């Protein structure tokens, strides 16, 4: 009897708590509608465009007011740790959802997340430049496939530190040479700081000329790099392969500067401080910093060709993404760094270099596969122009633009995976077991990055896989003197400081390629890859706008609900209108809460009730 009484009391308390929770939510919903009703049209658009309204009942009126005041005062200053380029444990959020992070991009435009799951670690960085409108998305993935992953990591990190001791002279000199940091640069992870700097004789940008002229130590470093460079890539090849102009992309840039480097210059400084080497490409090509664009208007021909010299406000903003994966057979490259091992790794000939390009609706994709010393590197680069951008910044980074971008990312993942799997079937060397093992490993060893001014990254553990932030330029098309499209996939893999580079030579350009459906192994993959099935949509839909622009939405009629109006309910939130509610009226005469229908129309172009097109097709504009 006592047990039944206690159970009844417990259930009564639970139901009372549920009722209180429901009442609190209803109160918050009422406060939300009242808050929106009292907003001026300017304040409403400000909060809507920055996705600060949220869902009715989700936030209190005080929270909404705080968001409004915060957005009016301007974005908060960037983390001081970020300006220093150091790692911070505050960024580590293992449980955070990547989807939540991507949604936050639309609010802040500058976010960093990192985490770890098992033997996999990831780091994602988003940067928006309000001056140029450029959006840079960088995803780096490190995978340690050794059975003793923890031991291997602990074993290699001291090795990396010891090796970097050889380069104190070089790194400290580069830090002195490059005191100015880029305000929008991503903070590097450990593997980025340990990546290989490539130093070759290519025409430098303005920043690189300045860096080289300041320090004889830097020239000595470059000389050491040249002495240890593989005989397969003599310096005489560099001028012939370093430049090529692609008319459809209107830029030219050197690509081989990252493909070859010295094991003694493997550890370089943070992304912001590095000017020589891989960042040459970033500066000359994609220009993530608007202030830097203005200051370098008189830069090199690379800069002029990319449209920087015309001013960041005049050239179309661009999203650049890089998706990379390195496949390494477990058990290889575990020996300690030595002259003999470096010589062996550099004496093996790159083979099976393949390049493939496709362009659809302005989205240019480039794929490359190359192999050297048993390390096979696959690179997929996507260049996405944003055609509709306001001067205030990346205003089109709504859920529509984000989803379009992510569809391109995931399509790139799919094509890259297909490229890898189909290539594995025709692998000329290695046993069947090795091929099967590589095919299985490739599912968890892919990484993507989008670049503006970042540097190539390589892993510091013996069998890890990482993405390259600067490879947005590294895998873009280059060419030989014959003018054919070609590509250099300039990854440098280091196994316990054993460097091996992979470079693509020339490949024929082909339009279109049949792709088999790609499946993703979710069991051991990173959270980011769980987005694949959601965003990997039909490519036929890439060119179709999925919603209305803010200007198109604002042109729709809006009114306030009056006391004499017939009682109606918003079909989006299923809430009755009250006096003073702001309603938006569609051409089909259906009305909705302004905040409800605006969110709907940002991702859809039809009325939620009758499914009629809100705008005639002739009046639609592409939102991407």
Swiss-Prot record:
Acts as a positive coregulator of ESR1-mediated transcription in breast cancer cells. This is E3 ubiquitin-protein ligase RLIM. Residues 142-153, 455-507 have a biased composition (Low complexity). Expressed in many tissues. It catalyses: S-ubiquitinyl-[E2 ubiquitin-conjugating enzyme]-L-cysteine + [acceptor protein]-L-lysine = [E2 ubiquitin-conjugating enzyme]-L-cysteine + N(6)-ubiquitinyl-[acceptor protein]-L-lysine. Interacts with LIM/homeobox factors such as LHX3. Interacts with LDB1, LDB2 and SIN3A. Interacts with LIMK1. Interacts (via N-terminus) with TERF1. Interacts (via C-terminus) with ESR1. GO terms for cellular component: cytosol; nucleoplasm; nucleus; transcription repressor complex. The gene is RLIM. It holds the Pfam family zf-RING_2. It is an enzyme of class 2 (transferase). It is linked to Tonne-Kalscheuer syndrome: An X-linked recessive disorder characterized by global developmental delay apparent from early infancy, impaired intellectual development, speech delay, behavioral abnormalities, abnormal gait, dysmorphic facial features, limb anomalies, and urogenital abnormalities with hypogenitalism. A subset of more severely affected males develop congenital diaphragmatic hernia in utero, which may result in perinatal or premature death. Carrier females may have very mild skeletal or hormonal abnormalities. Residues 445-454 have a biased composition (Gly residues). E3 ubiquitin-protein ligase. Acts as a negative coregulator for LIM homeodomain transcription factors by mediating the ubiquitination and subsequent degradation of LIM cofactors LDB1 and LDB2 and by mediating the recruitment the SIN3a/histone deacetylase corepressor complex. Ubiquitination and degradation of LIM cofactors LDB1 and LDB2 allows DNA-bound LIM homeodomain transcription factors to interact with other protein partners such as RLIM. Plays a role in telomere length-mediated growth suppression by mediating the ubiquitination and degradation of TERF1. Residues 1-11, 214-229, 329-339 have a biased composition (Basic and acidic residues). Keywords: Acetylation, Disease variant, Intellectual disability, Metal-binding, Nucleus, Phosphoprotein, Transcription, Transcription regulation, Transferase, Ubl conjugation pathway, Zinc, Zinc-finger. It is found in: Nucleus. Pathway: Protein modification; protein ubiquitination.
